[in-house]
Amino acid sequence: MNLTSLPHTIHWHGLLQRGNWQNDGVPGVTQEAIKPGEDFTYHFIAAPSGTMWYHCHVNVNEHVAMRGMWGPFIVDPREPLPLEKTVTRDFILMLSDWDEKWADKPGYGGVPGDVFNYFTINGKAYPDTQPLRVKKGDVLRVRLIGAGELIHSVHIHGHVFKVAFKDGHALPAPYDADTIMVGPGERYD
């Protein structure tokens, strides 16, 4: 049930909608926006496994960036890969950016040379971001999700990433990276 005063949909990044296009959440294309007071039930098979995310697809600038209408969507595999079985801590970092001057202007957004007001991790800008607290010996899975309009460079001082998944899919050969460049909609584990 849409209990807000604005229309909404949910669009799924990475979730396959084979034979189920009407649940993809693109207003005016796969469904009509859900008006205030109306309801819509999304039906889908949670496949493939991996790191995905969802967001409102109506006035994306305002609803995603300013109102935070997005989140991670994780589908666990039936049979984890050997590398996944070594993980002791799992962190999700949704990287976003926004500029208040574009918030209420559907179809507008960052233009070349534009400087955004805020850069966020899980919807929080520094100094309100949360630290990743770990213990010596922990094996971390860090799920990076590009939920903004810009490319975000991610680097953890004193450590190297082992990139094993891209856009929810296992890579044939994981690789080491000092810095990961996460673009809009991309996911890295």
Spans of features found by a protein language model:
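Copper-binding active sites and cupredoxin-like electron-transfer domains
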Residues: 1-189
